[in-house]
From Swiss-Prot:
Family designation: Belongs to the trans-sulfuration enzymes family.
Protein name, per record: L-alanine/L-glutamate racemase
One biological process term in Gene Ontology: peptidoglycan biosynthetic process
Function: Catalyzes the racemization of L-alanine to D-alanine, and of L-glutamate to D-glutamate. The activity is low, but likely physiological since W.pipientis wMel lacks canonical alr and murI genes, while D-alanine and D-glutamate are essential components of peptidoglycan.
Known partners and oligomeric status: Homotetramer; dimer of active dimers.
Upper taxonomic lineage: Bacteria, Pseudomonadati, Pseudomonadota, Alphaproteobacteria, Rickettsiales
Length: 403
């Protein structure tokens, strides 16, 4: 079955909910059992209720480990990934920090991409040292062999990196990690399983901000982790011990969003490519940081891993503009909203202050002010027209009026 068909059907068993096309939303804190023995068996992963179909013995004695609605979504995510088992988390950042805390203990050392999501970097800088974990931030375009220490337990990868969108040499990182028995975790939110499957390349853990493309409608916050074998068992034990709980209604919405993922991603990619090519030719743009563009320095590496590109990229303007000037540019846009997320239906734009981001890749000679762009589902010509008008407002001589 092709991926677009799997997306529509994944995680749903019509016979389980009396022929209804859509699974019900279960609002229940308690699971009832016919006998005490049935309860004990459920706690040991042998429930009489068939709600988890990934073949792993999971506790189903109390709904803090998930209602059927939660498990329908986790089943669907594992099906789409094509391997492994899935766990659902309250947010993408929760999933990131949870993965780190599972595999990084006091006295251990972790490697994290220099251009990772800034909230992850903040967690690594502010929280991990308190727990006795040493952190090294690495350049994703360079050889990491010399950065490995005897106590390195985890390598975090992001595909591609946040804001600057560098592509990591994933096969190199995985090879080094396996030689030293180090766990690898890949944040694959930008690509989704449609464009790249981390587990197929030997990565131990695939991680997603379901908030973004997977759910796709800007109406929930959620994360997910997919792994297999002993790695999954370690994650699952921590999952139970930390008491991670997810709301059933959010899982229903995310599961519904998955069914249109293929169509949405195709639209995001086509629109982003059209907009990016137009921006490449604009006199006020020094660089377009979108690896799908043929002239991107890592285009060939990108092609070797990814089936396509999503709708999120950055641009570097021709010079550094003041905060007031950037406000003048984006405050008056008609279609693009000013927002920190991406992956929904609506296009978003956000100036990025490089000086506030303490990472070396941001110090590279990309040009002037950074702006991140997410192309939603609107018409590409309308988006180009909106961007053209916004760029025409630079430089803003009268920032009070924006004219």
């Amino acid at each position: 079955m092709k991926e677009e068909s799997i997306l529509v059907k994944a995680g749903r068993k019509f016979n389980d909910y009396k022929g209804s096309m859509n699974p019900p939303v279960y609002h229940s804190s308690t699971i009832l059992f016919p006998t005490y023995k049935d309860y004990l068996n459920a706690a040991n992963g042998e429930s009489i209720y068939d709600v988890i179909n990934d073949g792993v013995a999971r506790d189903y004695s109390y709904s803090n480990v998930g209602t059927p609605t939660v498990h329908y979504l986790s089943n669907a995510l594992a099906e789409i990934e094509g391997s492994g088992q899935a766990l659902i988390y309250p947010s993408g950042l929760f999933a990131l920090t949870f993965a780190i805390l599972t595999f990084a203990k006091a006295g251990s050392h972790v490697l994290i991409q220099d251009n990772s999501y800034y909230r992850l970097r903040r967690f690594a800088e502010n929280e991990l040292p308190k727990r006795g974990t040493e952190v090294t931030f690495y350049d994703p375009t360079q050889d990491i062999t010399d950065l490995i220490q005897s106590n390195t337990s985890l390598i975090m990868i992001e595909t591609p990196g946040s804001v600057t969108f560098e592509i990591s040499n994933i096969e190199h990182i995985v090879k080094v990690a396996k030689e030293h028995k180090i766990v690898t975790v890949c944040d694959n939110s930008w690509a989704t399983p449609l464009l790249f499957k981390p587990l197929d390349y030997g990565v131990d853990v695939a991680l997603y901000a379901v908030t973004k493309y997977l759910a796709g409608h800007s109406d929930l916050v959620m994360g997910a982790i997919i792994a297999e074998g002993e790695i999954f068992k370690l994650l699952y034990e921590s999952y139970k011990n930390y008491g991670v709980t997810i709301q059933s209604h959010d899982c229903y919405l995310a599961h519904r969003g998955l069914r249109t993922l293929y169509t949405r991603m195709k639209r995001h990619q086509n629109t982003a490519m059209e907009v990016a090519k137009w921006l490449e030719k604009h006199s006020k743009i020094k660089k377009v940081l979108y690896p799908a563009l043929p002239f991107h320095p890592q285009h060939e590496l990108w092609k070797s891993y990814f089936k396509g590109a999503s709708g999120t990229f950055s641009i570097a303007l021709d010079r550094e503009y003041s905060c007031e000037e950037l406000s003048c540019m984006v405050d008056h846009m008609k279609i693009f909203g000013i927002g920190a997320s991406w992956g929904g239906c609506d296009s978003l734009i956000l100036p990025i202050d490089r000086r506030s981001m303490s990472r070396s890749v941001m110090n590279s000679d990309y040009g002037g002010s950074f702006i991140r762009i997410f192309c939603g589902l609107e018409d590409p010509e309308d988006l180009i027209s909106d961007l053209n008008a916004a760029l025409a407002r630079l430089p803003c001589l009268n920032t009070k009026t924006g004219r």
